[in-house]
Each structure stands twice: as structure tokens, then as C-alpha cells.
Amino acid sequence: MPGGLLLGDEAPNFEANTTIGHIRFHDFLGDSWGILFSHPRDFTPVCTTELGRAAKLAPEFAKRNVKLIALSIDSVEDHFAWSKDINAYNGAAPTEKLPFPIIDDKDRDLAILLGMLDPAEKDEKGMPVTARVVFIFGPDKKLKLSILYPATTGRNFDEILRVVDSLQLTASNPVATPVDWKKGESVMVLPTLPEEEAKQLFPKGVFTKELPSGKKYLRYTPQP
């Protein structure tokens, strides 16, 4: 498909009609981190569970200075009506308000620009719908992570929150997060960091795992 973003690309400063009115994307993001996530259609089962979970986790994203914004090829009017179903699914009052806006991309302009269309999933007119895309942008407006799911597989928003924790931690410290890492657990010191410098940067200690190769690349430290 034409369009699309690669890691490190700056987010296009697009304009869009949303459930909070007309926006410019860079103005919407401000100095925050941002997550732009698309879904195939309003009033569908998997999408309802996804946005319901995103709504429940919205306070956790806000604590991390992350703004959420959703997108689909449905109209703002549909977004408002569907929001009632999402809130009801969450056991809340069936209002039109969600803790994040949803973009109206019924002409598919943004879906094409950002490479979000799923050619395997079509609407009633035979046109491709948006896939389950997740873009995470840093305060510099650059793409830090992208994930693409097919329509049949719902996303894990707890995992997306975990990824945000990793991205924010590693943006300000010379560390990486190992497999299955969770916030508060030990992290790995980057192999490029000299040993003496690592000791100075991480006063809680640097612990090296001995390996048959004799190479000292598995270095752990408590989370800074």
C-alpha cells in the first residue's frame, strides 16, 4: 500500500475532523507522547473491546504524559453513537464521551497517507478498511514504535502501556529492557557503555552474568 511511516519518521502534521472538533496533529500532541491507533469499523465486536480497554487505561497513559487518539473510516456521528456502546460495555453510563478523541477518516485520506489500510478486509462496498495499527510518537513528534495487527486479532493495551514504560525509560537512560520486562524490574546496560562509566551512572550496581563465551555483555542494573 502507498504511504506509511518508518521508525524515526516525523509524524505528518495532518488536519482532521474528530470527536473533539478539528485538529492539527502536532498541536494536539503538544509536548506529550502520543499514541495514534486505528481500528477497522465502529459497531464491531473486537473494536468495541479494544476501545473499551483503552478507555479504562486512559488514566494510566495520562500519568505517563501520553495522549491517545483513535481513527477509523467511520464518521464523527458514528463515533459518537458507538461511544455509548463502548461505555456501556465498560459498565459505565452510556454517554457519547470517551477519554480520547476518534478521527473521522471516512475518505481514507489519512489511512492511505499513514499506510493503515488492510487489503484483506473490505467494507460493504468492497473498499479496504483500516487495520489495527499502533503508532507511538515521542515528544519530538518522531515515530518510536509501530505495531500492525490484522482485523481478527485484538490488541493488548496492557502490553502497549508496558512498551510506553520501556520507551520512556530507555529514552533517558543508556539501558534496554529485556524479554517480558515490567516497570520496576532490572534492566540491561547497553553493551556500548564502558564498564567504568556504567559503574558511575548506576550507583545501585551493575551485575554481569558469566557466560561460556567469556563475553561480558549480559549486564543488569536495577531500574534507574
Swiss-Prot record:
Phosphorylation at Thr-177 by MAP kinases increases the phospholipase activity of the enzyme. Phosphorylated form exhibits a greater lysophosphatidylcholine acyltransferase activity compared to the non-phosphorylated form. Irreversibly inactivated by overoxidation of Cys-47 to sulfinic acid (Cys-SO(2)H) and sulfonic acid (Cys-SO(3)H) forms upon oxidative stress. CDD domains: PRX_1cys. Changing residue 32 to A: Abolishes lipid binding. Its EC number is 1.11.1.27, 3.1.1.4, 2.3.1.23. Optimum pH is 4 (for phospholipase activity). The active site is a conserved redox-active cysteine residue, the peroxidatic cysteine (C(P)), which makes the nucleophilic attack on the peroxide substrate. The peroxide oxidizes the C(P)-SH to cysteine sulfenic acid (C(P)-SOH), which then reacts with another cysteine residue, the resolving cysteine (C(R)), to form a disulfide bridge. The disulfide is subsequently reduced by an appropriate electron donor to complete the catalytic cycle. In this 1-Cys peroxiredoxin, no C(R) is present and C(P) instead forms a disulfide with a cysteine from another protein or with a small thiol molecule. Homodimer. Interacts with GSTP1; mediates PRDX6 glutathionylation and regeneration. Interacts with APEX1. Interacts with STH. May interact with FAM168B. May interact with HTR2A. Thiol-specific peroxidase that catalyzes the reduction of hydrogen peroxide and organic hydroperoxides to water and alcohols, respectively. Can reduce H(2)O(2) and short chain organic, fatty acid, and phospholipid hydroperoxides. Also has phospholipase activity, can therefore either reduce the oxidized sn-2 fatty acyl group of phospholipids (peroxidase activity) or hydrolyze the sn-2 ester bond of phospholipids (phospholipase activity). These activities are dependent on binding to phospholipids at acidic pH and to oxidized phospholipds at cytosolic pH. This is Peroxiredoxin-6. It comes from Rattus norvegicus.
